[in-house]
Amino acid sequence: MGGTSAIDALLDAARADLDRVQPRNLATEFAAGALVVDTRPVEQRQRDGELPGAVVIDRNVLEWRIDPSSPHHIPEITDTGRRVIIVCNEGYSSSLAAVSLRRLGLHRATDLVGGYQALRAAQTAALPDGGLRGESL
């Protein structure tokens, strides 16, 4: 078996259209008004730590919570022009999630390169302390 798997090809295609954020730039993006969304499962957040200032949304309800036309959208999203940065554990599912949000019209959606683990490894003070909110549909 050789070559690239179908999921690798899908991921490569997704990332080709994203202007992904480097861990060192996350605080700057946040300060400029980006909404940072942590989609890691609760078990990973409990094990590795929370991302202060991020809104916590389970991946399985992300589109409903971020789509401004959905009756279930979070109050931080009022239109499709807001910069949204998705953070998962290692930066894989977040790329696919960002593309899904772009398909909903959020043309500035993107993700964090390497996810939370890259942020942690860089020992970057990513976001100012802020309250985290768990979100569900």
Please report, for each region that a protein language model flagged, where it lies by residue:
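Rhodanese-like catalytic fold shared by cysteine-dependent sulfurtransferases
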Residues: M1-L35, V42-R83, Y92-L137
